[in-house]
Swiss-Prot record:
InterPro entries: Aa-tRNA-synt_II (IPR004364), aa-tRNA-synth_II (IPR006195), aa-tRNA-synth_II/BPL/LPL (IPR045864), Asp-tRNA-ligase_1 (IPR004524), Asp-tRNA-ligase_1_N (IPR047089), Asp/Asn-tRNA-synth_IIb (IPR002312), AspRS_core (IPR047090), GAD-like_sf (IPR004115). SUPFAM superfamilies: Class II aaRS and biotin synthetases, GAD domain-like, Nucleic acid-binding proteins. Its main location: cytoplasm. CDD domains: AspRS_core, EcAspRS_like_N. Residues 206-209 are annotated as: Aspartate. Keywords: Aminoacyl-tRNA synthetase, ATP-binding, Cytoplasm, Ligase, Nucleotide-binding, Protein biosynthesis. This is Aspartate--tRNA(Asp/Asn) ligase. The gene is aspS. GO terms for molecular function: aspartate-tRNA ligase activity; aspartate-tRNA(Asn) ligase activity; ATP binding; nucleic acid binding.
Amino acid sequence: MADLLGSMRRTHNCGVLRKEDTGKTVTLMGWAQRWRDHGGVIFIDLRDRYGVTQVVFNPENNAEVHKLADSIRSEWVIAVQGEVLERPDGMVNPKMETGEIEVMVSDLKILNKSKTPPFMVEDNAEVSENLRLEYRYLDLRRPRIAKNIMLRHQVGACVRAFLNENEFLDIETPVLTKSTPEGARDYLVPSRVNTGLFYALPQSPQLFKQLLMVAGYDRYYQIVRCFRDEDLRADRQPEFTQIDLEMSFVGEEDVMGIAEQMIAKVFKDVMGKEVKTPFDRLTYKDAMDRYGLDKPDLRFDLELKEVSSIVEGSDFKVFASVVKKGGMVKAMNAKGCAHFSRKVIDDLTAFVAVYGAKGLAWIKVKEDGSWQSPIAKFFTDDEKAAMAQTLDMAPGDLIFFVADNVKVTNDALGHLRNRVAKELGLIDENEFRFVWVTEFPLVEYDETDKRYVALHHPFTAPMEEDLDLLESDPGAVRSRAYDMVLNGTELGGGSIRIHQPEMQEKVFNMLGLGQEEAEEKFGFLLKALAFGAPPHGGLAFGFDRLIMLLSGENSIRDIIPFPKTQKAACLLTDAPSEVAFEQLAELALRIKKDPAS
């Protein structure tokens, strides 16, 4: 096949030329984005992943090239050679990085034609997400998406450079592994050579990185693909990428310290932003008490206050009965929000109902200091005074109350706090506020299964001072776990691990994993821990989520090259898809048909 390029070779990309390059002869290659004819002179915006350059075809310079340019259409692939000229006065485009120059073309080659695209390959084109994902290769040409993909590369390169400099080893772990379901479902892969047996795709490299610590590789990392068969949300994908770290001979502060340095380097080198270290610390208890959520957004105040002790003896039976049953009454002072209409309050009441709240009580403080509220009449002067002091009430304030069990109360008010902050414009979108949340509960009680389950995973070490509670009060045991939170979003989490087999067996037993089941699922880990496992810990960052936050995108699908839909489908390749009967037969599998279909 003939070489369409001939002697042409690209000298510059479409985003690099500036006024200083005037007079140079250059060769550019890319896609024709826009085509315009002004008085017989043809202007084409030539695009590649680096940017856009205006190229000009004047019939007086080369009539043959001009005639060929007249045939070019949107998204054709072309190569041009010509001279860089400074744009005439009044023709400079300040919106383009190359807007001070243009290239007067002397030679043109059409490298490939294109069908008419199903949508304009431009950032401002209105197009459905499904169509974008079906033609993802076109969507990836759009400057905004291309910028996100390049940002992804830059962050990955920065992370690797930092960890390499700090003596971490990039070690691959298996993709086909054993199914040890904890929480989310595993993706299963049938084995052809071992009929009836299955591999699982890893939800994380957790166990293998711990085994690497046992093996003596004291600093490990991977930017690794992980898989979870779970329902999708805006920030979830069935396959995702995480920055995975593990270190030996460390405590919590060592792991958090290296993670802070890594994130600070990413922000400085990639984003040009200085990040103050060390990051703030909040215990899980403090986070829940003050913000209602274990992922608090600290860019604004609006702290929550418990008022259970003030209202437990009040005549307002809704509050008093909740406290009597062991629940909680909590409040949030929305400063200066007494102007909120009843409709707004009704909307917020419906909002907290999503999180299980049965109602949203409220009090407006009028200019004379008196209360306007359906519940004001139920409180004595002493109770009012105590609430006013606890909640720092002042004229113009609006106080919201939720009374329910501890989980519902915190969940409802925590999300209400975020909602009100957005509506009041309290959030500085240019601020990056980090916080470590520490000392999570080791376990939580599952009401459905009537047993304790690990809050993070069953390999998390309990705090030394709580070991005596493992058998008597498991729910009170704090773990050596830590989450890094940025602007109310969990960036990553980790823990110090259990490194002694006796303690690991004890925790398994507390979680209802008998010796036989523990041996079946995790026998290889218990065996390894018995061969001199060092104290170790680590963490994993959600790489996709980090890129989403850095790029300012609202959907994780806009920062992944080839994402799945909310139904875990790839519209580009039409996956998942049926497979041939012969393939199933080789695996000794048969599809059970739905009787309703």
